[in-house]
A protein has these predicted regions:
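Glycine- and acidic-residue-biased ligand/ion/polar-headgroup-sensing regions
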Residues: 77-96, 106
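Extracytoplasmic
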Residues: 56-61, 77, 87, 113, ...
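A short beta-loop-beta micro-motif enriched in histidine and acidic residues
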Residues: 53-58, 69-84
Length: 153
């Protein structure tokens, strides 16, 4: 074997040996990762199909915090939105009287173009992460609908 070939083989073995720890480190973190599906939906929680707006996609993520006894007030979202409750207890009401109760760790596909009100009905402040799937310069994320409040007799 030529001296050049022996030197090349030695260098290759040394490089492979040096990179071996990095290869095992790349595998280890994936073995320590746990994936839990929070939501998989084709419809909002009130049964309406989810449709994305046209145009350049723009995703917005918000942390929404509601104090004890607080509420969002009546509003609607013209774009699809998806939330995960981190803390507190959330009650979402529709004008037709339907309600959805969320506890920490639960997720939902919010209603689209439907007036609703979210209230913190728990005993601790509420924290909710919501992602909105909108389009650049198209619709707002939320539109107030104070006239949608259900009438009480």
């Amino acid at each position: 074997m030529s001296r050049h070939l022996l030197s090349l083989r030695s260098v290759s073995i040394c490089v492979a040996a040096a990179l071996l720890p990095f290869a095992t480190q790349a595998i280890e973190p994936s073995q320590a990762v746990k994936v839990t599906q929070l939501l998989k939906a084709t419809q909002t929680w009130n049964g309406v199909p989810i449709k994305y707006p046209e145009g350049q996609a723009e995703v917005t993520g918000l942390m929404i915090e509601i104090a004890l006894g607080g509420e969002t007030h009546w509003h609607e979202h013209p774009v699809p939105s998806f939330g995960v409750l981190l803390e507190g207890t959330l009650e979402v009401s529709l004008t037709d009287g339907r309600k959805k109760l969320l506890k920490p760790g639960e997720a939902l596909a919010e209603v689209i173009a439907t007036a609703h009100n979210g209230r913190n009905v728990g005993t601790t402040p509420l924290k909710l992460i919501v992602f909105y799937a909108g389009a650049v310069d198209k619709q707002p994320l939320s539109v107030p609908r104070p006239e949608s409040k259900p009438k009480t007799n």
